[in-house]
Amino acid sequence: MSGDKPHGRLVILAGPSAVGKSTVVDRLRSDVPNLYFSVSMTTRDPRPGEVDGRDYFYVTAQEFQEKIDRGEMLEWADIHGGLQRSGTPAEPVRQAREEGRPVLVEVDLVGARNIARLIPEAETIFLAPPSWEVLVERLTGRGTESQDVINRRLETAREELAAQSEFKHVIINDDVDTAVSAIKAVLLGT
C-alpha cells in the first residue's frame, strides 16, 4: 500500500436468512462507486438466477476444505446445523482495502464475529427484519427450501437476532431505500 492512500473502509453485513441482504447488496453494488463486494464461497447449491462468481463461488465440500488448509480463507463456518459451509476468500478483501476501495463483506453471525476479531476497525452492521412474523413470511414465501431447511434457518435466525447488540450498527430493513441509504453512509463514512 502506498503511504498516501488510506485503507478502504471494511463493512461487515450480517443478518438472518430472508431479511433482504441480497436485495440490499444488489442496490449497493450499483449505487456505490468503486465498491468491492466480497463474493463468499459456499458449498450450497445455487438458487435460481444466481451466478457462480457473482453471487457466490460454488465449490464442493472437498474444495472448500482444501482452501481452508492452504490458508486462503479470511473466515469460514459450518452453518444451518451443518447443511453447508460458507466463507470469505482473504486475498481479494486485502487487495481492495490496499487500493483504498470501500469493502462490503456479507457473512453470517460467526463470520462477522471472526472478521471483527481479526480486523477490529471494521464497521459491523446487523440487518434486522421489522418483526419475527415478517421474517418467517419472507423465508417461507421463497419456496426454494424444504420445511426441514426452513426450520433450521429459523432456528439460526433466533440465535442471530439475539446477538444483534454485538454489532456497531443495527438497521431495520422495513424499507429497502432507507436501509440502503443507512448502509451507504457507513460504507462511505458520511
From Swiss-Prot:
One of its GO terms (cellular component) is cytosol. It is an enzyme of class 2 (transferase). The keyword ATP-binding applies. Residues 8-188 form the Guanylate kinase-like domain. GO terms for molecular function: ATP binding; guanylate kinase activity. Belongs to the guanylate kinase family. HAMAP family: Guanylate_kinase. Essential for recycling GMP and indirectly, cGMP. This is Guanylate kinase. It comes from Corynebacterium efficiens (strain DSM 44549 / YS-314 / AJ 12310 / JCM 11189 / NBRC 100395). The gene is gmk.
